[in-house]
Amino acid sequence: MALNIADLAEHAIDAVPDRVALISGGDQLTYGQLEEKANRFAHYLIDQGVKKDDKVGLYCRNRIEIVIAMLGIVKAGAILVNVNFRYVEGELKYLFENSDMVALVHERRYSDRVANVLPETPDIKTILVVEDGSDDDYERFGGVEFYSALEKSSPERDFGPRSEDDIYLLYTGGTTGFPKGVMWRHEDIYRVLFGGTDFATGEPIEDEYGLAKQAAANPPMVRYPIPPMIHGATQSATWMALFAGGTVLLTPEFNPDEVWQAIHDHKVNLLFFTGDAMARPLLDSLLAAKDAGKEYDLSSLFLLASTAALFSTSLKEKFLELLPNRVITDSIGSSETGFGGTSIVAKGQSHTGGPRVTIDKNTVVLDDDGNEVKPGSGVRGVIAKRGHIPLGYYKDEKKTAETFKTINGVRYAIPGDYAEVEADGSVTMLGRGSVSINSGGEKIYPEEVEAALKGHPDVFDALVVGVPDPRFGQHVAAVVHPREGTRPTLAELDAHVRTEIAGYKVPRSLWLVDEIKRSPAGKPDYRWAKDVTEERPADEVHANHVAANAK
């Protein structure tokens, strides 16, 4: 049994060739059409000299061509590299060089950036350009239009041998440092991120053809992953759909009004998003439509799934009020662990802080001595994943040794997320240790404070960082994007958050901003938030705290 991603996709293609696989705008592809175009793309790469394990970059928003390329890359035995479409030249140069990229697929709108970087990245010899309505010149650097390249290549499925040991590279977002390439075996990432484990039982799906057989026996589910394909969660939703004969809806931009309209138009069954950064605009859009008397037919929608980012309790409650009888899930995971745990959101949940989830059997919380934290002990530990985990970071032995550790004979992935184990065995996420705040010896995790802040009616979005404090070393600083027409004060926020978190965690200074900077997938940019606090004085500082940069 070879649990290779290309093989798994081909099993579904053979089972349901006439079924719609992809929808984007007014375009759609059946599984058979996807197969033909992906084969052509794979052969084009091979004809251009791309070899097994060579790296091919995908610098595109969500659209049909990116999935054709993803499938074609694994068919050719190459390795895809997800490129953040917000990266500017310096970041692109780093990623292109770090990944040893030899080929690139990009949307035409990014041609100027690509042109500026290519002279410094001479290993990139093959460039395909996806038309997107822009008119940037790509012929100056030898770019070839995507579909014209495919026309010249073979549509046949005649490729070399594949293995479950082939490498799948998943680059991290780089919001707390340089992006790192996480190296997964195909079988391992299939098991923990791409649907190779039964969701209900937690047991591996043993039959290589199992998902394809289910596809042939059942009508398709329509999945709509909103985050960009650079995000592991969207790659997960896409591959899971393709292995199971489902339909994937793709939209290049996040527009909350258009999301609800797309669900109405395409009878979407499963919606995927990343925490508050997408949930809050979606909720506001749905409320505005309701007030305006606009009705969407959302009867097909039965699952709303948030992954990999803070999803505040207050927003969950409001979604349940507007969309009763739906399943709403909140999951944890990372590029280094895959999914680690999920909770089904229920009415009346009273806990604060980060997500509270039921972890899977291969996820544990370890204390400082490497022992599993006992439920209800109050001990804080780190999330650790065993079993199907990555090989390490690409070209970074030092960071690999720091993150992937063998403890008591068991190898774990430990990316640095802290958590507490509740008395019932569920786990409350506290946040990444690298962005924690040390105030007077107390360790404070931003997500818990951010969740409390975002429960205030005047707060649209917020990030929390530590700033220098002459007495405590650091204190908690809030960078807040207010709702339109409001200006929350530090005293108002103080009074609100004290009802949810301990006093030492309460923000002592406040910066108001027009927008919170996040990655395209909604991940917080703490470096940006730190820069805000360093570049200008605070709008308010608590009377008992004197910050060096206060007004």
Curated annotation (Swiss-Prot):
Domain of life: Bacteria
Disruption phenotype: Not required for growth on rich medium, nor with cholesterol as a sole energy source. Cannot use beta-sitosterol as a sole carbon and energy source, it can use 1,4-BNC (3-oxo-23,24-bisnorchola-1,4-dien-22-oic acid) an early intermediate of beta-sitosterol degradation.
Pathway assigned to this chain's UniProt record: Lipid metabolism; fatty acid biosynthesis; Steroid metabolism; cholesterol metabolism
The keyword Hydrolase belongs to this UniProt entry's keyword annotation: no
EC supergroup of this enzyme: ligase
PROSITE patterns attached to this UniProt entry: AMP_BINDING
GO biological process: cholesterol metabolic process; fatty acid biosynthetic process
Gene3D superfamilies with a match to the protein in the record: 3.30.300.30, N-terminal domain of ligase-like
Keywords, sorted A to Z: ATP-binding, Cholesterol metabolism, Fatty acid metabolism, Ligase, Lipid metabolism, Nucleotide-binding, Steroid metabolism, Sterol metabolism
Gene Ontology MF terms: acid-thiol ligase activity; ATP binding
Record EC number: 6.2.1.2, 6.2.1.3, 6.2.1.42
Stated role: Not essential for degradation of straight chain sterols such as cholesterol. Catalyzes the activation of medium/long-chain fatty acids as acyl-coenzyme A (acyl-CoA), which are then transferred to the multifunctional polyketide synthase (PKS) type III for further chain extension.
Protein name: Medium/long-chain-fatty-acid--CoA/3-oxocholest-4-en-26-oate--CoA ligase
Protein species of origin: Mycolicibacterium smegmatis (strain ATCC 700084 / mc(2)155) (Mycobacterium smegmatis)
